[in-house]
């Protein structure tokens, strides 16, 4: 049910790309609930103290997961979107660089942090997010995704920085 609710859009956002649209999953309340239940069952009673969601679709899965786990939710955002003092981390995109930010007081030394995003492709966003959380003293060992595109290699990249990678659905291609 979860996999079948994710629509594939050809040539979006550019020719040659087959885009996996997780918003179609969220339009189906049974599929969305089933997705959240998989994450809740996997991460209940694991000692997680904070869930970080990356802008923007990571919020849609990370925040309800944190609520169900009874832990804090921490948004990681693009520059200028967070009101309190932040630290930043730049990372490489396919064509250029981007920056992510986190509040300096969102993670405390020893927090066991779970990273959540909708889709894993190159792993650059989650690698930068891992660096931010670790700089603040967080213990980051796990990253969870609704969708993984294994042909792109992000899971291997994240395993290389010490993360356990979990995804609900793997899709071939780019």
UniProtKB/Swiss-Prot annotation:
Question: What catalytic reaction does the record list?
Answer: AMP + diphosphate = 5-phospho-alpha-D-ribose 1-diphosphate + adenine
Q: Which SUPFAM superfamilies match?
A: PRTase-like
What keywords were assigned to this record? Cytoplasm, Glycosyltransferase, Purine salvage, Transferase
**Any one GO MF annotation of this record:** adenine phosphoribosyltransferase activity
Q: Which PANTHER family match?
A: ADENINE PHOSPHORIBOSYLTRANSFERASE (PTHR11776), PHOSPHORIBOSYLTRANSFERASE DOMAIN-CONTAINING PROTEIN (PTHR11776:SF7)
Q: What is its main location?
A: cytoplasm
Q: Where in the cell is it found?
A: Cytoplasm
For this UniProt entry, which residues form the secretion signal?
none
Query: Entry's InterPro entries?
Result: Ade_phspho_trans (IPR005764), Adenine_PRTase (IPR050120), PRibTrfase_dom (IPR000836), PRTase-like (IPR029057)
Taxon lineage:
Bacteria, Pseudomonadati, Pseudomonadota, Gammaproteobacteria, Vibrionales
Question: What does the annotation say about its assembly with partners?
Answer: Homodimer.
- State whether keyword Membrane applies: no
EC numbers, comma separated: 2.4.2.7
Q: In which pathway does it act?
A: Purine metabolism; AMP biosynthesis via salvage pathway; AMP from adenine: step 1/1
The similarity annotation says: Belongs to the purine/pyrimidine phosphoribosyltransferase family.
Tagged with keyword Transferase: yes
Gene3D superfamilies xref list? 3.40.50.2020
List, in alphabetical order, the GO biological process terms annotated in this UniProt record. adenine salvage; AMP salvage; purine ribonucleoside salvage
Tell me the enzyme class.
Answer: transferase
Q: What does this protein do?
A: Catalyzes a salvage reaction resulting in the formation of AMP, that is energically less costly than de novo synthesis.
* Gene symbol of the encoding locus: apt
Protein name listed in UniProt:
Adenine phosphoribosyltransferase
What HAMAP family is this protein classified in? Aden_phosphoribosyltr
Which Gene Ontology cellular component terms are annotated? cytosol
